[in-house]
């Protein structure tokens, strides 16, 4: 038997930054495609706009900092940030919302701290939170899924509404579902209904939950789950953060549902609604802003899952991943300090 002889170091080859970012973008495309199918061409338009602004703004800042523009842009990190912002923003949000959010992510959150590898917050999530607080109306105006919408939005109308604006009556016309009720995301609907005194069973009887999870959102999450599993297979990301998020969210929601099913929604709805799979696989796993050790990544992920459940259930924002990830980013150095692996021959890591 012939053995292959190689010199040290005997380590598996890791991806270059540009290759890693490229793989993340490619694995996210199935989710983007399904999101576009259910919510219209606005998803693609917003993503392309955000990616273009991200590249342009990063190039300008790098030029001002006297850095190599071409080599830095080739790492594809700006493209990924733009993509995440574009798919997180409502499809028919005005163009200036996307531009402001992308500029904030690249210029303030990323480059102001020194560029890739130095930022302490996830740029896309920081931009999303800034936009949500600053422009709550524009950031919560989701259209009805195309399969139940009274007027599905085509490509031309999406362009017109994003770049030239539309009247309130026109927007409402596109937001109306077949039952004549202005549509919101499934999590928004449940949150509003519970505040009005309805039970979860009564809320889940609405048209938006005709498939049991929220029309469109189940398939969107399933597509991002498939892309995330491919990333795990390719070793683009590690499983610890994702597992921590999903396990903590499942356990917390399961306990709540067992205690009071009329007030708390079940685990499956939490896992397959909103941005759960997108955040668990594509956002929270950002190696720059997450914890680094194995135990630290598990704790980091579990913290996000717990925070998401708390904010979704008791807070004012139905989908809480952006807030949860930013809070976990703040805790990452603390987690790393106390979760350092034990050095061989020593009693503890500290």
Swiss-Prot record:
Where does the signal sequence lie? none
State its Enzyme Commission number(s): 7.-.-.-
Where does it reside?
A: Cell inner membrane
FMN phosphoryl threonine modifications at: 185
* Membrane topology designation: Multi-pass membrane protein
Name the major location: membrane
Answer whether the UniProt record assigns the keyword Signal to this protein.
no
Which cofactors are named for this entry? FMN
Mark the transmembrane ranges: 25-45, 89-109, 129-149, 212-232, 239-259, 264-284, 298-318, 319-339
Q: Which cysteine-cysteine pairs are annotated as disulfide bonds in the entry?
A: none
- Keywords tagged on the record: Cell inner membrane, Cell membrane, Electron transport, Flavoprotein, FMN, Membrane, Phosphoprotein, Translocase, Transmembrane, Transmembrane helix, Transport
Which branch of life, at top level?
Bacteria
Cellular component GO terms, alphabetical: plasma membrane
Q: Which Pfam families match?
A: NQR2_RnfD_RnfE
Q: Any one Gene Ontology biological process term?
A: electron transport chain
Q: What class of enzyme is it?
A: translocase
Biological role stated in the UniProt entry: Part of a membrane-bound complex that couples electron transfer with translocation of ions across the membrane.
**Similarity section:** Belongs to the NqrB/RnfD family.
> Quaternary state and partners of this protein?
The complex is composed of six subunits: RnfA, RnfB, RnfC, RnfD, RnfE and RnfG.
Query: This chain belongs to which protein, by name?
Result: Ion-translocating oxidoreductase complex subunit D
Which species does this protein come from? Answer: Shewanella sediminis (strain HAW-EB3)
Q: Which gene encodes it?
A: rnfD
């Amino acid at each position: 038997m012939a053995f292959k002889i190689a010199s040290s170091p005997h380590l598996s080859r890791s991806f270059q930054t540009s290759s890693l970012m490229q793989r993340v973008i490619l694995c996210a495309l199935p989710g983007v495609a399904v999101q576009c199918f259910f919510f219209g061409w606005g998803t693609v338009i917003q993503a392309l706009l955000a990616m273009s602004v991200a590249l342009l703004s990063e190039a300008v800042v790098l030029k001002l900092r006297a850095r190599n523009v071409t080599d830095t842009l080739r790492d594809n990190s700006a493209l990924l940030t733009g993509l995440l912002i574009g798919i997180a923003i409502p499809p028919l949000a005005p163009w200036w919302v996307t531009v402001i959010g992308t500029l904030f992510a690249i210029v303030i959150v990323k480059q102001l701290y020194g560029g890739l590898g130095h930022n302490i917050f996830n740029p896309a999530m920081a931009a999303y939170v800034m936009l949500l607080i600053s422009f709550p109306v524009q950031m919560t105006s989701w259209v009805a899924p195309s399969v139940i919408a009274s007027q599905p939005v085509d490509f031309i109308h999406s362009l017109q509404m994003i770049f030239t604006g539309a009247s309130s009556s026109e927007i409402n016309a596109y937001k109306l579902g077949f039952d004549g009720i202005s549509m919101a995301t499934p999590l928004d609907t449940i949150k509003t209904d519970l505040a009005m005194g309805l039970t979860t069973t009564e809320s889940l009887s609405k048209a938006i939950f005709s498939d049991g999870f929220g029309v469109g959102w189940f398939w969107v999450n399933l597509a991002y789950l498939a892309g995330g599993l491919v990333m795990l297979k390719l070793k683009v990301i590690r499983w610890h953060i994702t597992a921590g998020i999903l396990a903590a969210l499942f356990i917390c929601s399961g306990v709540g549902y067992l205690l009071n099913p009329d007030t708390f929604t079940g685990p499956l709805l939490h896992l397959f609604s909103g941005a759960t799979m997108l955040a668990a696989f594509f956002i929270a796993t950002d190696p720059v802003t997450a914890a680094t050790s194995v135990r630290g990544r598990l704790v980091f992920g579990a913290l996000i899952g717990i925070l998401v459940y708390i904010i979704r259930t008791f807070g004012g924002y139905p989908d809480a991943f952006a807030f949860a990830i930013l809070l976990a980013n703040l805790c990452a150095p603390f987690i790393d300090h106390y979760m350092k692996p034990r050095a061989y021959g020593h009693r503890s890591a500290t």
